[in-house]
């Protein structure tokens, strides 16, 4: 039976966590599966052919996801981002996009993808109400791209997907995780590609998400270093901060780019983001060790008001600030993997 949304459920006034941070953004993982095996997310030695992915019955249904989005919207969330795994592997994803796009209070609906399946789905996603798209792209070099993705899928396939998304009317952002000595020498090529096509490149510091990605501090390229590299060729002017990214415009007027500095310049103090896994666990930090099982609450027959209390109560007790404490008391602590949390 379809759950009835309670239009009158009352949200706590000015919901804040223990550090006075509001709840504004929700990232929703719709699948734990991916057709890439990027080493910082799903290394093949741990996610091989015999890896047991989640059974379909354990995933939240689209109806359950939409119901939770209504609850989060009542608590102040205005921005939704769909992630994975690779979200475009979830069948009929455009149906979910349409359901979320129709929810009052949601003003921004975006998707993060590796782009490999985008060509065939871009138009349907736009028609359903998707507003923006972000494509992960760590290299333009054909051989290095396939090495980093540990996949037979070519970079050309991803570029065709990006072009299809742009042609369908979606603003495109490109996410690049730089690693020293691995792909940092391709940064300027990515900048030139983004500028030429009117996309926004975001350079992300290599982060220690989960416990299986082999993270070492020596491979982190600090945002300041990456920015200096770009500015030496293409002068930059600061715009300000937007969410997790520091925004900079090109002085010649040809667009902008961003830098996400979770390691060198943590932004925990302004983080307003929650994460919902494909099985309905609520995480209040990308580096969290455990989540809150909302699927169990949903499937127990809870009312929307009860869901509101559970979610609101969890956020009100939130005190996460891992990136500010990195290296102090977090060594050896098992954390959820990026592919599970949705990045």
Q: Where would I find each of the regions flagged by the language model?
A:
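Radical SAM/AdoMet-radical enzyme domain recognition
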Residues: 59-81, 89-202
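A short acidic, helix-capping loop that chelates divalent metal ions and anchors anionic groups
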Residues: 48-52, 119, 141-149, 210-214, ...
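Conserved alpha-helical substructure of the radical SAM core
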Residues: 2-84, 88-107
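Auxiliary Fe-S-binding modules of radical SAM enzymes
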Residues: 2-25, 192-196, 206-343
């Amino acid at each position: 039976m379809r759950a009835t949304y309670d239009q009158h459920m009352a949200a706590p006034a000015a919901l804040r966590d223990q550090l006075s941070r509001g709840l504004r953004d929700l990232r929703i993982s719709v699948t734990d599966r991916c057709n890439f095996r990027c080493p910082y997310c799903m290394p093949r030695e741990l996610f091989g052919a015999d890896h047991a992915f989640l059974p379909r019955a354990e995933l939240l249904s689209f109806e359950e996801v939409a119901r939770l989005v209504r609850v989060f919207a009542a608590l102040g969330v205005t921005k939704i981002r769909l992630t994975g795994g690779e979200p475009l592997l979830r069948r009929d994803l455009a149906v979910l996009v349409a359901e979320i796009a129709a929810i009052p209070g949601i003003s921004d609906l975006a998707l993060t993808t590796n782009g490999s399946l985008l060509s065939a789905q871009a138009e349907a996603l736009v028609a359903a109400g998707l507003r923006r798209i972000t494509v992960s792209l760590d290299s333009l070099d054909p051989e290095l791209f396939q090495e980093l993705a540990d996949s037979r899928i070519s970079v050309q396939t991803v570029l065709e997907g990006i072009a299809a998304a742009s042609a369908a009317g979606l603003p495109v952002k490109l996410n690049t995780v730089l690693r020293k000595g691995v792909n940092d020498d391709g940064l300027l090529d990515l900048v030139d590609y983004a500028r030429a096509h009117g996309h926004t490149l975001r350079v992300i510091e290599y982060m220690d998400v989960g416990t299986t990605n082999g993270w070492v501090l020596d491979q982190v390229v600090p945002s300041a270093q990456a920015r200096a590299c770009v500015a030496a060729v293409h002068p930059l002017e600061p715009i300000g901060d937007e969410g997790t990214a520091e925004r900079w415009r090109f002085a010649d007027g040809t667009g902008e780019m961003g830098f996400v500095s979770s390691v060198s310049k943590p932004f925990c103090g302004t983080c307003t983001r929650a994460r919902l896994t494909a099985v309905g666990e609520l995480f209040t930090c990308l580096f969290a060790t455990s989540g809150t099982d909302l699927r169990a609450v949903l499937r127990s027959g809870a009312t929307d008001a009860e869901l509101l209390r559970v979610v609101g109560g969890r956020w009100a007790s939130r005190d996460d600030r891992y990136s500010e404490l990195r290296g102090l008391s977090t060594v050896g602590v098992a954390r959820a993997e990026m592919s599970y949390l949705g990045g």
